[in-house]
Amino acid sequence: MTNSSPRVKRRTDTQYLHSVSSKLPKVDFDTNNEEFFEEEFEIYDPFYRAELPCPKPSLSISKHSIAKVPSNVNKRLELQLLLTSGTFLPNSRPYLSERVRKHTHLLSNSITGDDKPSLIHVDFTPEECFILQEAKLKFGPVNSVQFNDAYSTHISPKLPGRAYEDCQKFEIDNPSLSPVDKHGAIILRTYKKNKKLLPDYLKSFYNAGSSYFQREQVHQLMDGESVFFLKPWKHFNETSGDTVCVAYNPLCEKFALGSTAQDGAYNRLGNLWIGDFHSETIQSLESHYKLNQVGEKEYSTISDLCFSKGNLFLYTGAFDNAVKVWDMEGNLCGIFNAPTDYIHKLALSDDDLLAVACKNGYGYLLSTDNSTGEILTSANLIYPEALEKGYSASLIEFSNFLGRSSDKVIIGYDSFHTSNNRGCLALFDASTASFVQKFNTADEAFTSLYMHPSQVGFVASSNTLSNGRVYYLDTRMYKVCLNFTTTQKDINHATISNSGILVTSSGTDNQTFVWDSRKPDKPLSLLKHGKTKMIHFDGANEEEVDAGINMAQWQPKGNLFVTGGSDGIVKVWDLRLNNPFIQNFTEMNSAITYGGFSEDASKLTVCCVGGDVNMYSLGNDNGNKFGEFRIIENRLLT
C-alpha cells in the first residue's frame, strides 16, 4: 500500500454488510483481479501499527532526575559554574569579605565532622547585584534599619541562600553594589576528625604511653621515624644508565649521583651529576671517560662517590681507572690515575684520608690539600697472598670505634672476575700503609662490609658455592665473634641495627634474613619481597641472575629498617615486632638499584632500573607530586 492509499476501517457487523450488499448491483466477482481488491479493500500493510488503547496512563519522569555527567567534565569547575550562574541554588550561599578572602589559605585542610568539601564563599551574581540595587532605591542602604526590616519579607525571597549579613559584607566591599568583572566560588577542602595523622605503628606507641609524645621527645621522634613523614620532592631521569650510588654532603646542602654507562651507541654523557638542594639545580660533570680507537669519548661507570667531612670536596671513582676530586661548584681539583684497573670502592676517614679499592687487587690511601683539593700523597695497601691468587679488592672501609674512625682499614677481596667464589678479609694500618693480618674467616668471596656508626663492631658477608655467611667482628680485637649461615647464594648487603643487636642479610633471592646476635643459631625473621620486575630468559635460575634486594638501610638514629627489591617496592619494617612489616613506602616501575637516607634523615633517594631517581624530603609542600631539578650548563673538561 502506498502512502496515498486511503485507510478503510474494517466492519464486522453482518447486518450492516447485508444492507449494503442488497443495494449494490449484482456483478460477477473476479477474485483473480487484483484491482478489484484494491478498490474495495485496504491492502494489508505488515508495517502498520494499530493504536491500542492504553489501560493505564504513563507516569511522568521525576523532575528531580539528574542527567549523567560526561566523564570528561571537570566536576569541580562544573560546580563553580552552577553556583555562580544562579541556576543552582543551595540552601546557603555564604559571602566572605574581601579582607577575609586574602587569607583563605589559613583555612585549608581544616578538620570537620565529615569528609565533604564545604562551600564557604559565593560571589554575588549580576542578577543579585541588580536586585540589591533596586532594593536600595526603595528601602535605602543595606546597612540601614529600614532595609533590615524589609529583608526577610521583600528581599530574601529574591536572593535564595543569602543572609542579611552577606549583603552587608558585599556593600562594604562594593558600595555601589555593581556587578564585578569576575565572580566565582570558594570550596574548602576538609578531612575527617578521625583521619590517621600518624601510622598505626606510631599510634600503638601513643596508646602504650603518652610520655613518648612529650615535647622534649618530638625531635627524637622525627629523627627516628622520619620515613613516615617524607613526601615526594624531586624526580630526575637524565642519567646515562642505572643510578648505583648516591652521596650527600654532611650539611645536606649538596648531593651527587653516580650511574652506569652503556656500551656502543647507547653510551652518553650523564654518568656523574652534582646537585644543590637549596637552588634545586643539578649539573653533569664530564670527566670520567676513556677515548676509544677513533678518538671518541666513551663515558665510564661511576662505581662510588663521597663528600669530604669538611663539605668542600666530592671524591669519585669510576671504571676509567681514576679517582677524581671536585669542588662544590663542579670544578675538577685533582686526579689520581695510578690504578691499572677499575675503581670498585671508596672510603673516607674523619680526617679526610681517602681509601680506594681497585680491581687489580691493590688498595690505595690518598691525602688531599684541605684548601685546593689537590692530591698530595698516595700509598699502596698490598696483601701479597691476595695478589698471588689474583683476588680483586672490591670492598674497603675505615674501622670505627665508638663513633670515630680509627687508623685501621679493612679490605674485602673476591674472585668473581674469574668465576670463582674465593676471597678473604684483611686488615691494614693506615698510618704506615702496611698489612696487619688476615681475619680468621674462610677463604670465601666477600660481598659487603657494614661498619656500625657508633659501636665497636662490623659485619662482613661472603658467598660460598652453596650458601652465604655473615661474620660479626669486634673492632677492639679484630676477630670474628659470631657467624650466621644463610641459604642465600649471593648476599648484596649485610647490616647491623643501631642498637648493635640485630644483624641482617639481604640477597638476590629478594629476601632478608634477620638474626638476634644473642641467639645466632636461628633466624629471627624472614623479610620477603614480591615477584621480580626484571626480565630473565626462560629456565634461568632467578637467584643467580636477579638483582634481588639492592637497598637495605636502617633509619638513622631509629629502629626502622627499609628495604628495596627487584619487585620495585620499598618496604618499611620494625624488626622488634613479632610481625615486622609496617607499610610499603613507595613502588617504582622497575627493580630498585639503590636507596639511601641523608645523614640527618631529612632526605631519602630511591633509584630504579632505567635511571629514574625519586627524592623524598621532609617539610616540602609539593602536594605529594614530584618536581623537577633545573639543569644548568655542563662542566666540559678535557
UniProtKB/Swiss-Prot annotation:
Its main location: cytoplasm. Keywords: Chromatin regulator, Chromosome, Cytoplasm, Nucleus, Repeat, Transcription, Transcription regulation, WD repeat. It holds the Pfam family WD40. It is found in: Cytoplasm; Nucleus; Chromosome. Component of the Clr4 methyltransferase complex (ClrC) which contributes to the establishment of heterochromatin by specifically methylating histone H3 to form H3K9me. ClrC preferentially ubiquitylates H3K14 and ClrC-mediated H3 ubiquitination promotes clr4 methyltransferase activity for the methylation of H3K9. H3K9me represents a specific tag for epigenetic transcriptional repression by recruiting swi6/HP1 to methylated histones which leads to transcriptional silencing within centromeric heterochromatin, telomeric regions and at the silent mating-type loci. Component of the Clr4 methyltransferase complex (ClrC) composed of at least clr4, rik1, pcu4, rbx1, raf1 and raf2. The cullin pcu4, rik1, raf1, raf2 and the ring-box protein rbx1 are components of an E3 ubiquitin ligase, whose activity is essential for heterochromatin assembly. Interacts with nup189. This is Rik1-associated factor 1. It comes from Schizosaccharomyces pombe (strain 972 / ATCC 24843) (Fission yeast). The lineage of its organism: Eukaryota, Fungi, Dikarya, Ascomycota, Taphrinomycotina.
